[in-house]
């Protein structure tokens, strides 16, 4: 939609048509907020489900982590260039969660500084554990006994840290 600086609509340039995606079973991720491990701080999250999703089945969980520190892992993953891996994994039968734990950017300075000087806490693995436990209580399709984690760059570091620490 093209607009003047006064926000008056001028012309529609193009309109996205996702009808073919919807026919294939694609659904938008579920965005929500949950409490961090401190039980008071809100963290932002998303759940991605396979196109063949069946609420009566149990799905293994993959936690995609990218703690930054300069950017977020959770953006508009619906059609972003980085979401290919997320969409591929859900179609293999996983439920993917993305959790912006304390220490990630683009919130308050104190939120971002949570892991300052303590890189091992970047992205707060404790927040990821808390959110996944909370989710498994309300979303019975999530198999809490089968949880994996993966990420790139800082997310790879956080994944290795989680494997060694937990």
Language-model-derived ranges and their functions:
Residues 1-166:
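Serine-hydrolase catalytic core recognition
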């Amino acid at each position: 939609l093209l607009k003047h600086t006064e926000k008056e609509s001028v012309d529609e340039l193009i309109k996205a048509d996702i009808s073919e995606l919807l026919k294939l079973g694609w659904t938008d991720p579920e965005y929500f907020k949950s409490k961090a491990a401190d039980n008071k701080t809100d963290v932002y999250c998303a759940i991605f489900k396979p196109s063949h999703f069946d609420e009566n089945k149990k799905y293994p969980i993959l936690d995609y982590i990218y703690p930054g520190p300069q950017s977020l892992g959770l953006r508009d993953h619906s059609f972003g260039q980085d979401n290919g891996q997320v969409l591929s994994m859900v179609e293999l039968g996983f439920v993917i969660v993305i959790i912006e734990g304390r220490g990630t950017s683009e919130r308050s300075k104190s939120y971002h500084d949570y892991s300052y000087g303590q890189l091992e806490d970047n992205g707060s693995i404790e927040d990821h554990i808390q959110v996944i436990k909370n989710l498994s209580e309300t979303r019975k399709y999530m198999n809490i006994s089968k949880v994996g984690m993966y990420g790139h760059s800082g997310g790879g570091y956080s994944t290795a840290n989680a494997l060694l620490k937990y």
